[in-house]
């Protein structure tokens, strides 16, 4: 199964999902599936910016010997983004409407991340 197929499957399975992306920790997009429209100017650019938040969280956890960061969520008035580490170099992120199914998004990230890691 291709990266895009996994990302598309996550988007189709989560109510309110507007995007699912596989990205490098450097913020470079590997692949993204967009669905619907978000009330945000540019979802792709926003997800790239969020990669910096994930990097900062990982560095803070390492500095304080708190262990590895598995997941980071960012909720704004217009969008909720949940990112999950796939490997030390990659993560996947789902963006959804504030009233979207956050629990299902988190579950699908958890079960899909190992599949993507095998394909990297």
Residues covered by each model-derived region:
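Non-catalytic interaction/Regulatory regions outside core domains
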Residues: 1-120
């Amino acid at each position: 199964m291709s990266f895009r197929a996994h990302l598309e499957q996550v988007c189709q399975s989560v109510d309110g999902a507007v995007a699912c992306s596989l990205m490098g920790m450097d913020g470079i997009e590997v692949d993204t599936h967009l669905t619907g429209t978000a009330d945000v100017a540019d979802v792709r650019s926003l997800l790239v910016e969020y990669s910096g938040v994930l990097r900062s969280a990982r560095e803070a956890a390492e500095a304080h010997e708190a262990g590895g960061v598995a997941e980071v969520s960012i909720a704004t008035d217009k969008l909720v983004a949940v990112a999950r580490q796939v490997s030390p170099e990659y993560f996947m992120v789902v963006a959804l409407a504030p009233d979207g199914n956050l629990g299902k998004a988190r579950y699908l990230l958890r079960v899909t991340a190992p599949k993507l890691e095998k394909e990297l």
